[in-house]
Amino acid sequence: MATQGVLAKYRLPPLPTIGEIIKLFNLRAEKQLSQNFLLDLKLTDKIVRKAGNLQNAYVCEVGPGPGGITRSILNAGVEELLVVEKDTRFIPGLKMLNEASSGKVQIVHGDILTYRMDRAFPKHLKKPWDDDPPNVHIIGNLPFSVSTPLIIKWLEQLADRTGPFTYGRTQMTLTFQKEVAERLTASTSSKQRSRLSIMAQNLCNVKNCFTIPGRAFVPKPEVDVGVVHFTPFIQPKIEQPFKVVEKVVRSVFQFRRKYCHHGVSILFPEESRLKCTEQMLRLADVDPTLRPTELTMTHFKKLCNVYREMCDQNPNLFAYNFREELRMRKLQGKTTEEGEEDDLQR
């Protein structure tokens, strides 16, 4: 894992403050885009330090907005900074930073959810997966509305070694709502233990670095924000395809308030549900009366391994979709297990 970064001696020339940039270009945070600006450069410097040593690094910043974190990244002495910004209103301010940094900033007007990061940086930066992480980093103050789908997308690309992970074990330093940050890093039996905990910790060393109070942002969000650092493992804890792990974990946590056998059961069609659920839990040596939050990574590893074997024996099993069965039962006027529907809406 990279050592904690130290901001380099490089400094941008005098520039308008972030607050002045916002006034100069008449920028306002758009509520529908979940935008919140971080103006305190001491905090943006702290975020960048948590990314590790960025001297001569290649960095992709997600959603730079008015450029607070962007300035801190440039001051860390990076070789090149790629910024991906969806909102055209921020482009003029980012161009100003590019000029001030002698062309170190590449500006992409686009959506990070669809941007091809496998083409973002020079090929010579690629490192073998079992080597140290490449000198490539992802940093971003993520809009709340995209943070969860984005990290799930990146985790899948990490598992497949595609997207930003074509360069190797690319590290990420990202902001999330405090609750999401706690879920990503939650340990076994903690209240915040969730699907995100397993999916992230299966593939990465995940560290909740520090919390930024909501009052530090403009406009002030209703929640605090957590800064999370991800360093991909050489080998995942669960050596199964991402889709297999995701399906098992999602199913188990579908009924987080109940015993884990409820979630396991929805992996199987109604006609074989009881038999297959008992078989899977027995072969995985998992107590059916444990709650989902009480299951360790080893429990999930065993569950995924057994489920994969069962899918290999029954090629149609993986395609089974409990939600579709539930929809058909509703159309036919059949009732669901008490509380089942409420849990599925969560």
Swiss-Prot record:
It catalyses: adenosine(N)/adenosine(N+1) in rRNA + 4 S-adenosyl-L-methionine = N(6)-dimethyladenosine(N)/N(6)-dimethyladenosine(N+1) in rRNA + 4 S-adenosyl-L-homocysteine + 4 H(+). GO terms for molecular function: DNA binding; RNA binding; rRNA (adenine-N6,N6-)-dimethyltransferase activity; S-adenosyl-L-methionine binding. GO terms for cellular component: mitochondrion. Keywords: DNA-binding, Methyltransferase, Mitochondrion, RNA-binding, rRNA processing, S-adenosyl-L-methionine, Transcription, Transcription regulation, Transferase, Transit peptide. Residues 1-27 form a transit peptide. CDD domains: AdoMet_MTases (cd02440). Belongs to the class I-like SAM-binding methyltransferase superfamily. rRNA adenine N(6)-methyltransferase family. KsgA subfamily. This is Dimethyladenosine transferase 1, mitochondrial. It comes from Xenopus tropicalis. The lineage of its organism: Eukaryota, Metazoa, Chordata, Craniata, Vertebrata.
